[in-house]
């Protein structure tokens, strides 16, 4: 995955090539400006919301689209399967959704000498940095549903960077079937002074990896000399394991 750290509001230029862009933090002005520029072309779009439920299942809904058929929004894959009918295209009016417990995907295809498809995956970031450590195990805050949704989404973002088996990658592959997607063809954009989101891309919060490290470290503390000390090490390991 390419990681682009933004300084002085200088963003990469996306040429006429398909692209999947993960936007961490507030990049709404960039998205709005980009869409304004491509609105001069024939354009079809759909917008998805991703919201975790109380047990952590991701609910994905299409909430906007260029066109409906019999009251149902059609998506970009259907637009392509219909052979790009221009009459279904429309301009896209970007809305500044300020919502930390929802992830949005803007799936846009436009014609500029050739059909170009852009996916913007938009996540504002951690709502409260005091819950940062809960990214390792979001279920520690499951009693606070708003915080739980936000921290679970942060965990999913972290996994897409550090784990081959990513829920978000699986989801994108269902939305984008033109060819198989993996994280290595994605671009992640974050602002240089957005410290919480920078941690998401440079610090691994994977619970299984934490457990493996803790287990290995505590195993190295066990000796053949003292049963009592070994029991203390084991108790400490069990106490820490319960907290992550």
UniProtKB/Swiss-Prot annotation:
Keyword list, A-Z: Late protein, Virion
UniProt GO cellular component terms: virion component
Keyword Transit peptide recorded: no
Compartments it resides in: Virion
Induction per the UniProt record: Expressed in the late phase of the viral replicative cycle.
Job description of the protein: Late protein which is part of a large complex required for early virion morphogenesis. This complex participates in the formation of virosomes and the incorporation of virosomal contents into nascent immature virions.
Family to which this protein belongs: Belongs to the chordopoxvirinae D3 family.
Record protein name field: 27 kDa core protein
Source species: Swinepox virus (strain Swine/Nebraska/17077-99/1999)
Lineage, uppermost ranks: Viruses, Varidnaviria, Bamfordvirae, Nucleocytoviricota, Pokkesviricetes
